[in-house]
């Protein structure tokens, strides 16, 4: 174990503050509709131009280990806010910077850091309660579009495309952002449930023009078993033939005489049949098969449940209005599943998402939930250059997160004005002692910081705008993109409550930790190896 370097008290806090300010100063230039660009050097690629606060924060590593600790702690504010709400990272960083700078000054002047932290925590808690009181539900298309536009730095096209996507696949539907091939942004929607498995044999093709197989008003057999023996399916084929229905089969695999029998029946026109392999692998495959079973109203035929394939009857089969299968994909439309059962399944998956610690698992669970909820929308990003595409893609992803947050918890007036309205309601807040009151004043001062920075980035005078807004009431605010005052809702300047709330809570949490730091320990750096 190598030697360690240790700093104590004010010396430690000053190093923390330097790191916090270096990171925050780089990040906060991106805040607001007139936020500036930051260029990030990429070792093996062209430089990345971005206005995304969390992207800027992630790039920053400082040489001095003590200063770097401060930078990394504020980076945690940005990341935590991004994880919870998907946006608001720059706002959180600006709030944290003010809390840390003012808090460290107070501690150096002799104020008790623990009471200071209690005062800050009390203010943040009350501010969150006040935010929730003034929130307005975000359910209509216009509000959704406005939230997306604000988060995308004022691009109305992005706001509209996100709003259209939500209209098409629903509020819980999966919306993904991919790189497009043209200059224009495009929205592509896959209705119903789609999975990445196509027909087992080309002999099932019914439409030669686009090489696809289509079944309408068909019965559905789903099993997690491999079908190779014709005896397993003879009984059910006879029952379906008598009913003059078509059959769609999903199985682990179909081979040998069983596959030959299905192909011959299909070619001769005795029975319209389509067979595909089950999607996914391992445990995920079983869960996907259960999803499809619930969506189509069928029973998953599994020997684990004591059901043998050769003994099944029509009551265990599901139904769909239309199934289309190509070489690579299959889409199920109009599944005959019970709505309550589908809702229960969606709620179960939602719970699994909230409990999952893996980003990959969360993504796969969200895909499954979307397919049950009604479809998947893909926003394809268009641009002239790869650098522009990457920057635009990051902004659309931010806007999408903001929009989801708005639908979840509602909206408040944006541009930092909602925090000023809260400020007026908290001016009489009192702590248990004078040191706590000082903490309350620090947190109240921090509430002004986002508005000040937005105005500064737009070239305005922060103190004048702040005083004008403080002396007004309700929805009156400042549009930094035009330099005009007016009703923020009418001007379409709104923020999701979840984003503002998460920014406040993350900033208060990390700010309090940094203020109460008394010692810092780091490895000795080998200057020769640098």
UniProtKB/Swiss-Prot annotation:
Pfam families the record matches: Cpn60_TCP1
Localization terms from the record: Cytoplasm
EC number of the protein: 5.6.1.7
Gene Ontology terms: cellular component: cytoplasm
Keywords, alphabetical: ATP-binding, Chaperone, Cytoplasm, Isomerase, Nucleotide-binding
Coiled-coil features, chain-numbered ranges: none
Amino acids binding ATP: 30-33, 51, 87-91, 415, 495
Disulfide linkage: none
CDD domains linked: GroEL
First-tier enzyme category under EC: isomerase
Catalytic activity: ATP + H2O + a folded polypeptide = ADP + phosphate + an unfolded polypeptide
GO biological process: protein refolding
One MF term in the entry's GO annotations: isomerase activity
Keyword set includes Nucleus: no
Cytoplasm among keywords: yes
SUBUNIT field: Forms a cylinder of 14 subunits composed of two heptameric rings stacked back-to-back. Interacts with the co-chaperonin GroES.
HAMAP family named in the record: CH60 (MF_00600)
Function according to Swiss-Prot or TrEMBL: Together with its co-chaperonin GroES, plays an essential role in assisting protein folding. The GroEL-GroES system forms a nano-cage that allows encapsulation of the non-native substrate proteins and provides a physical environment optimized to promote and accelerate protein folding.
Family: Belongs to the chaperonin (HSP60) family.
Protein name: Chaperonin GroEL
